[in-house]
UniProtKB/Swiss-Prot annotation:
Residues 201-306 are annotated as: Disordered. InterPro entries: E2/EBNA1_C_sf (IPR035975), Nucleotide-bd_a/b_plait_sf (IPR012677), Papillomavirus_E2_C (IPR000427), PPV_E2_N (IPR001866), Reg_prot_E2 (IPR033668), Regulatory_protein_E2_N (IPR036050), Regulatory_protein_E2_N_1 (IPR042503), Regulatory_protein_E2_N_2 (IPR042504). Keywords: Activator, DNA replication, DNA-binding, Early protein, Host nucleus, Isopeptide bond, Phosphoprotein, Repressor, Transcription, Transcription regulation, Ubl conjugation. It comes from the Viruses. This is Regulatory protein E2. There is a cross-link at K329 (Glycyl lysine isopeptide (Lys-Gly) (interchain with G-Cter in SUMO)). Pfam families: PPV_E2_C, PPV_E2_N. Phosphorylated. It comes from Human papillomavirus type 60. Residues 224-250 have a biased composition (Polar residues). The gene is E2. The keyword Transferase does not apply.
Length: 404
């Protein structure tokens, strides 16, 4: 095609796009048409650039990389909207703003969203040190088998999340990351829809989950984590991975809550102070609160530590005897790609294995290959599970290792 033909084609496509703007249709088919026209327009621009043209009429052409990106973006939007049009939500109102690429990429990414509202976080409980976040009344997402679901955006002390169809919580924003920068004390309060959520008041007694919210009658939030039984060397079966599903403030603010006293405790492991506290009978008192574990004791525990009633130092020592792991099962290529992407999350785990598989075991191809991720403690693993998205189509289970 010569420059005149390309110019005519570009003008015709732009005219159709402008007509869609003027119509402002709320029908999903109109949005599919809009992105199809954008795809054709940027493919035309790409071809014209490849032919050496810098303008089509009075229209300057974008760089090749820009046209390629925009065309691929339009293809992606078209595919997602076509899939959505075959779901039960196709009859809802879908405007240009609801189906924009920018909105698709805002947290939570790769989901459609409607009716945003503001969540204000007061760092240090100071109204003058406030940061606004956007949450959504409705979030439309695809599950592992590409079925569409609609859910509500929710808020707790830790951040913004939505609950998936299987009951799992998917956090798409954690306040702790900004608190590292803007907060002096490591505390904040959350204000939204005439509700206030604050941290539990520190006391010597165990804090209830109800302390997370100041609204009377508000139910506490829990992070639903997958659990599966693991068998120990002695033949005992424990339910590893069953935990309270809301990460406590001490878990989320792990790096900030190390006080001077705790630092002194950590630095004096050679002669630790024996600090007696009330521990449930099923947990060995000496190993939970006593001296640091020896090399032979590492990995020797087969029971979970209590969630409260022991110091931070005692918890670290106790968990050293039972390093937690995450076993992921799936296709080899998916696991290898995911392992490569994990390089930016190295601070959230201790080490990981290469992709491997068991020999002489007949298992489905979808779960034949394995990958192990090892953590320093269960708190680190909980944070990892909230921040890192597991590869699609893979399954996982929790467990422990006696040694590495």
């Amino acid at each position: 095609m010569n420059q005149a033909d390309l110019t005519e084609r570009s003008d015709a496509l732009q005219e159709q796009i402008l007509n869609l703007y003027e119509q402002d249709s709320k029908d999903i088919q109109a949005q599919i048409q809009y992105w199809d026209l954008n795809r054709k327009l940027y493919v035309t621009y790409y071809y014209a650039r490849k032919e050496g043209y810098s303008h089509l009429g009075l229209q300057p052409l974008p760089a090749l990389q820009v046209s390629e990106y925009k065309a691929k973006q339009a293809i992606e939007m078209g595919l997602l909207l076509t899939s959505l049009s075959k779901s039960q939500y196709a009859s809802e109102l879908w405007g240009l703003t609801d189906t924009s690429a920018e909105l698709l990429l805002t947290p939570p990414r790769n989901t459609f969203k409607k009716k945003g509202y503001t969540v204000n976080v007061w760092f240090d409980n100071n109204e003058n040190n406030t940061f606004p976040y956007t949450n959504w009344e409705y979030i439309y997402y695809q599950d592992d088998i590409e079925q569409w679901h609609r859910t509500r955006g929710e808020v707790d002390y830790n951040g913004l999340y939505f609950t998936e169809n299987n009951g799992n919580r998917a956090y798409f924003l954690l306040f702790d990351s900004d608190a590292q920068t803007y907060s002096q004390t490591g505390t904040w309060t959350v204000h939204y829809k005439n509700q206030i959520i604050s941290a539990p008041v520190t006391s010597s007694s165990k804090q209830s989950s109800d302390d997370y919210t100041s609204k009377a009658g508000q139910q506490p939030h829990f992070f639903a984590s997958s659990s599966s039984p693991t068998t120990t060397d002695g033949g005992q079966t424990s339910q590893e991975g069953v935990s309270s599903s809301t990460t406590s403030p001490s878990a989320v603010r792990l790096r900030r809550r190390r006080s001077n006293e705790q630092q002194r405790e950590l630095s004096s492991r050679e002669s630790p102070r024996t600090k007696r506290r009330r521990v449930p009978d099923e947990v060995d008192r000496q190993s939970a609160v006593g001296s640091a574990p020896t090399a032979e004791e590492v990995g020797s525990r087969h029971r979970s530590l209590p969630r409260s009633g022991i110091s931070r130092l005692a918890r670290l020592q106790g968990e050293a005897r039972d390093p937690p792991i995450l076993l992921i099962k799936g296709l080899a290529n998916s696991l290898k790609c995911w392992r490569y992407r994990l390089k930016k999350y190295t601070r959230y785990f201790k080490c990981m294995s290469t992709v491997f598989r068991w020999v002489d075991i007949d298992v489905p191809e979808s779960s034949r290959h394995k990958l192990l991720v090892v953590f320093n403690d269960t708190t680190q693993r909980d944070v990892f599970m909230k921040l890192v998205t597991l590869p699609r189509g893979c399954t996982y289970t929790f467990g422990t290792l006696n040694s590495l």
